[in-house]
Amino acid sequence: MRPMTEEESKTFFEKLIKFIGKNVTLLIQRKDEPYCFRIQKNKVYYVSEELMKRSQNIPREGLCSLGTCFGRFTKTGKFKLNITCLDYLAQYAKYKVWVKPSSEMSWMYGNNLLKAGLGRITEDTPANQGVVLFSMNDVPIGFGVTSKSTHECRKLDPQALVVYHYGDVGEYLRDEDIM
Protein backbone atom coordinates (compact mmCIF):
# COMPACT_ATOMS: atom_id res chain seq x y z
CA MET A 1 0.00 0.00 0.00
CA ARG A 2 1.21 3.45 -0.80
CA PRO A 3 0.15 7.02 0.01
CA MET A 4 -1.86 8.90 -2.62
CA THR A 5 -0.13 11.29 -4.99
CA GLU A 6 -1.14 14.95 -4.94
CA GLU A 7 -3.32 14.54 -8.05
CA GLU A 8 -5.01 11.42 -6.66
CA SER A 9 -5.63 13.17 -3.34
CA LYS A 10 -7.20 16.15 -5.09
CA THR A 11 -9.55 13.94 -7.13
CA PHE A 12 -10.44 11.76 -4.15
CA PHE A 13 -11.16 14.59 -1.71
CA GLU A 14 -13.18 16.55 -4.29
CA LYS A 15 -15.48 13.54 -4.61
CA LEU A 16 -15.64 12.99 -0.85
CA ILE A 17 -16.35 16.67 -0.15
CA LYS A 18 -19.32 16.46 -2.50
CA PHE A 19 -20.95 14.03 -0.04
CA ILE A 20 -19.73 15.01 3.44
CA GLY A 21 -18.47 18.58 3.03
CA LYS A 22 -15.99 19.89 5.56
CA ASN A 23 -16.52 16.80 7.73
CA VAL A 24 -13.66 15.22 5.76
CA THR A 25 -11.32 16.58 8.41
CA LEU A 26 -13.18 14.52 11.04
CA LEU A 27 -12.25 11.35 9.14
CA ILE A 28 -8.53 12.06 9.31
CA GLN A 29 -8.20 13.88 12.63
CA ARG A 30 -9.97 11.38 14.86
CA LYS A 31 -9.76 11.56 18.64
CA ASP A 32 -9.48 7.82 19.26
CA GLU A 33 -6.52 7.10 16.95
CA PRO A 34 -5.05 8.52 13.73
CA TYR A 35 -6.36 7.20 10.40
CA CYS A 36 -5.09 7.63 6.85
CA PHE A 37 -6.01 6.86 3.25
CA ARG A 38 -3.84 4.45 1.25
CA ILE A 39 -3.93 3.02 -2.28
CA GLN A 40 -3.58 -0.62 -3.28
CA LYS A 41 -4.24 -1.60 -6.91
CA ASN A 42 -6.24 1.60 -7.69
CA LYS A 43 -8.49 1.11 -4.63
CA VAL A 44 -8.45 3.65 -1.79
CA TYR A 45 -8.57 2.24 1.74
CA TYR A 46 -9.28 4.01 5.02
CA VAL A 47 -7.07 2.40 7.64
CA SER A 48 -5.75 3.16 11.11
CA GLU A 49 -2.07 4.05 11.20
CA GLU A 50 -1.39 1.32 13.75
CA LEU A 51 -2.84 -1.34 11.46
CA MET A 52 -0.92 0.21 8.57
CA LYS A 53 2.37 -0.19 10.43
CA ARG A 54 1.60 -3.81 11.30
CA SER A 55 0.85 -4.66 7.68
CA GLN A 56 4.19 -3.43 6.32
CA ASN A 57 5.71 -6.93 6.63
CA ILE A 58 3.13 -8.35 4.20
CA PRO A 59 4.17 -8.28 0.53
CA ARG A 60 1.95 -6.27 -1.85
CA GLU A 61 1.02 -9.35 -3.86
CA GLY A 62 -0.28 -11.10 -0.73
CA LEU A 63 -2.32 -8.16 0.55
CA CYS A 64 -5.93 -8.25 -0.69
CA SER A 65 -7.55 -5.61 1.49
CA LEU A 66 -6.79 -3.57 4.58
CA GLY A 67 -9.28 -1.33 6.36
CA THR A 68 -12.40 0.02 4.66
CA CYS A 69 -12.46 0.41 0.89
CA PHE A 70 -13.74 3.89 0.01
CA GLY A 71 -13.67 3.38 -3.74
CA ARG A 72 -11.41 3.08 -6.73
CA PHE A 73 -9.79 5.11 -9.46
CA THR A 74 -10.95 4.34 -12.98
CA LYS A 75 -8.57 3.99 -15.92
CA THR A 76 -9.40 7.57 -16.93
CA GLY A 77 -8.32 8.88 -13.52
CA LYS A 78 -11.80 9.56 -12.11
CA PHE A 79 -12.77 8.34 -8.65
CA LYS A 80 -15.83 6.17 -7.99
CA LEU A 81 -17.09 5.73 -4.42
CA ASN A 82 -17.82 2.20 -3.27
CA ILE A 83 -20.79 1.10 -1.15
CA THR A 84 -18.40 -0.17 1.53
CA CYS A 85 -17.83 3.43 2.68
CA LEU A 86 -21.55 4.00 3.32
CA ASP A 87 -21.17 3.84 7.12
CA TYR A 88 -18.73 6.75 7.08
CA LEU A 89 -20.74 8.73 4.53
CA ALA A 90 -23.92 8.28 6.58
CA GLN A 91 -22.19 9.32 9.78
CA TYR A 92 -20.80 12.57 8.37
CA ALA A 93 -23.33 13.37 5.60
CA LYS A 94 -24.24 17.00 5.20
CA TYR A 95 -27.37 16.37 3.12
CA LYS A 96 -29.71 13.43 3.63
CA VAL A 97 -32.75 11.96 1.88
CA TRP A 98 -35.26 9.60 3.46
CA VAL A 99 -36.97 7.09 1.18
CA LYS A 100 -40.54 5.83 1.58
CA PRO A 101 -40.84 2.07 2.26
CA SER A 102 -42.59 1.57 -1.09
CA SER A 103 -39.51 2.81 -2.98
CA GLU A 104 -36.73 1.22 -0.91
CA MET A 105 -36.57 -1.97 -2.97
CA SER A 106 -36.58 -0.03 -6.23
CA TRP A 107 -33.58 1.95 -4.98
CA MET A 108 -31.79 -1.21 -3.82
CA TYR A 109 -32.22 -2.74 -7.28
CA GLY A 110 -30.22 0.15 -8.74
CA ASN A 111 -33.00 2.49 -9.93
CA ASN A 112 -33.09 6.26 -9.48
CA LEU A 113 -35.37 7.80 -6.84
CA LEU A 114 -38.59 9.43 -8.01
CA LYS A 115 -40.55 12.16 -6.22
CA ALA A 116 -43.22 9.58 -5.32
CA GLY A 117 -40.65 7.70 -3.22
CA LEU A 118 -39.26 10.76 -1.45
CA GLY A 119 -40.09 10.72 2.26
CA ARG A 120 -38.05 13.69 3.51
CA ILE A 121 -35.08 15.71 2.37
CA THR A 122 -32.67 17.94 4.28
CA GLU A 123 -33.59 21.61 4.02
CA ASP A 124 -31.62 23.75 1.57
CA THR A 125 -30.18 20.80 -0.36
CA PRO A 126 -28.90 22.21 -3.67
CA ALA A 127 -29.22 20.54 -7.06
CA ASN A 128 -26.36 18.22 -8.14
CA GLN A 129 -25.33 17.63 -4.53
CA GLY A 130 -24.15 14.33 -3.09
CA VAL A 131 -26.66 12.89 -0.62
CA VAL A 132 -26.94 9.79 1.54
CA LEU A 133 -30.25 7.93 1.37
CA PHE A 134 -31.89 6.48 4.46
CA SER A 135 -34.95 4.34 5.04
CA MET A 136 -37.66 5.98 7.15
CA ASN A 137 -36.16 4.05 10.10
CA ASP A 138 -32.83 5.93 9.67
CA VAL A 139 -30.97 2.95 8.21
CA PRO A 140 -28.52 4.03 5.46
CA ILE A 141 -29.40 2.32 2.16
CA GLY A 142 -27.23 4.13 -0.38
CA PHE A 143 -25.98 7.38 -1.83
CA GLY A 144 -26.58 9.43 -4.94
CA VAL A 145 -26.71 12.90 -6.46
CA THR A 146 -29.77 15.16 -6.37
CA SER A 147 -31.27 16.27 -9.65
CA LYS A 148 -33.27 19.13 -8.12
CA SER A 149 -32.94 21.35 -5.06
CA THR A 150 -35.20 21.00 -2.01
CA HIS A 151 -37.25 23.99 -3.12
CA GLU A 152 -37.76 22.57 -6.64
CA CYS A 153 -38.70 19.12 -5.26
CA ARG A 154 -41.82 20.49 -3.60
CA LYS A 155 -43.29 21.52 -6.97
CA LEU A 156 -42.47 18.36 -8.95
CA ASP A 157 -44.94 15.79 -10.22
CA PRO A 158 -44.72 12.29 -8.62
CA GLN A 159 -42.90 10.72 -11.59
CA ALA A 160 -40.10 13.30 -11.68
CA LEU A 161 -36.54 12.23 -10.92
CA VAL A 162 -35.19 13.47 -7.57
CA VAL A 163 -31.95 11.50 -6.88
CA TYR A 164 -29.65 9.82 -9.38
CA HIS A 165 -28.49 6.40 -8.24
CA TYR A 166 -24.81 6.13 -7.34
CA GLY A 167 -24.60 3.22 -4.91
CA ASP A 168 -26.87 1.06 -2.74
CA VAL A 169 -26.67 -1.78 -0.23
CA GLY A 170 -27.99 -4.19 -2.87
CA GLU A 171 -24.54 -4.06 -4.47
CA TYR A 172 -23.29 -6.36 -1.72
CA LEU A 173 -25.35 -9.12 -3.35
CA ARG A 174 -25.16 -8.05 -7.00
CA ASP A 175 -21.39 -7.49 -7.03
CA GLU A 176 -20.19 -9.79 -4.25
CA ASP A 177 -17.67 -11.54 -6.51
CA ILE A 178 -15.77 -8.31 -7.35
CA MET A 179 -15.92 -6.63 -3.92
UniProtKB/Swiss-Prot annotation:
Record localization: Nucleus, Nucleolus
The UniProt subunit note reads as follows: Monomer. Interacts with pre-ribosome complex. May bind to RNA.
Q: What does this protein do?
A: Required for proper 27S pre-rRNA processing and 60S ribosome subunit assembly.
SMART domains in UniProt: PUA (SM00359)
Asked if the Swiss-Prot or TrEMBL record annotates the protein with the keyword Disulfide bond, the reply is no
Domain spans labelled PUA: 94-170
This protein is called what? 60S ribosome subunit biogenesis protein NIP7 homolog
Any Gene Ontology biological process: ribosomal large subunit biogenesis
Where mainly found?
Answer: nucleus
PANTHER family membership = CYCLIN-DEPENDENT KINASES REGULATORY SUBUNIT/60S RIBOSOME SUBUNIT BIOGENESIS PROTEIN NIP7
Q: Which GO terms describe its molecular function?
A: RNA binding
- What's in the GO CC field? nucleolus; preribosome, large subunit precursor
* Keyword field: Nucleus, Ribosome biogenesis, RNA-binding
Lipid metabolism recorded as keyword: no
The text of the family note is:
Belongs to the NIP7 family.
- Protein's organism: Dictyostelium discoideum
